[in-house]
């Protein structure tokens, strides 16, 4: 019951810890984009036991949107990182790395989302 975090290499957020992520392609569903980004960023697509939406964020000007999902998998694995990330760590709930990407920090500091994560963890055996 641990979470995979990836350490970013881009100059704007270098060293910050985040999650697998990226933009969907034209006419690509959110789920297909999710599977593609997982494969691109960690080198393989583990079998998804469950995919649970955590947050659907839209900026005030409606120009920026992102979805955050929790993907439950059977077993932890050794990620094969692409150039977007320089490191990874598997962390227990609320024991995540200190230097979180600002957007992820906001997400994980949201009481409602933390409650949802805890509920899901309690249900996953």
Give short role names for the model-derived ranges:
Residues 19-54:
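The catalytic Nudix box helix
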Residues 6, 34, 38, 88:
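Hydrophobic pocket/interface hotspot
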Residues 24, 57, 73, 85, ...:
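Hydrophobic pocket-lining residues within nucleotide cofactor-binding pockets
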Residues 12-16, 62, 68, 78-125:
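Nudix hydrolase/Nudix homology domain
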Residues 43-77:
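Active-site segment of metal-dependent pyrophosphate-handling enzymes
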Residues 1-19:
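N-terminal strand-loop-strand
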